[in-house]
Amino acid sequence: MTTTQIKNIYTGTVMYEGESGMTTRQMLEKAIASQADLRGANLGGADLYSANLGGADLRGADLRGADLRGANLYSANLGGANLGGKFGKLIEGRPYFQCGPLGSRSDYLQSFITDKGIVIKAGCFTGFLDDFVAAVKETHGDSDHGKEYAMAILMIEEHAAIWGQP
């Protein structure tokens, strides 16, 4: 019987092994439930939409391209997790904030406080906060969606001010 695995991004060692046919999300939720040590887990590109990651220790994990929309990250430790390339690594503490559904797509807006600044993921947009603010102004202006995004941006800025914007 073949199995699927979560490996350490740095050493390549198997951190958790799941049953054949399990999605990464299912395997990760099972690993968290069994209190597996997932520090440094290679989760790049994983579909973790609406996953229950509450309480997980994902310090130093590779989250490049992972879909975290709607995921429960309550009490999850994401310090030092890698968002990839130009976006840097998450700071220690509370680097993640999510709100929604909102905007023209009625989707979740995610923000990450990294060592290089605040990164936003909203729909197909992934970029720094300043670029997101400009895109919202250009696309939505003073419409209801624009106003809703503006309020979310204020919350994101406050969250970053409280929890350690670099």
Feature locations, PLM:
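Extended, small-residue-rich solenoid/repeat segments and analogous flexible loops
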Residues: 1-67, 161-166
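Charged phosphate-binding loop/patch that engages nucleotide di/tri-phosphates or the phosphate backbone
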Residues: 147-166
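Alpha-helix initiation and N-capping motif
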Residues: 24-25, 48, 126-129, 149, ...
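Leucine-rich solenoid repeat scaffolds
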Residues: 74-118, 122-135
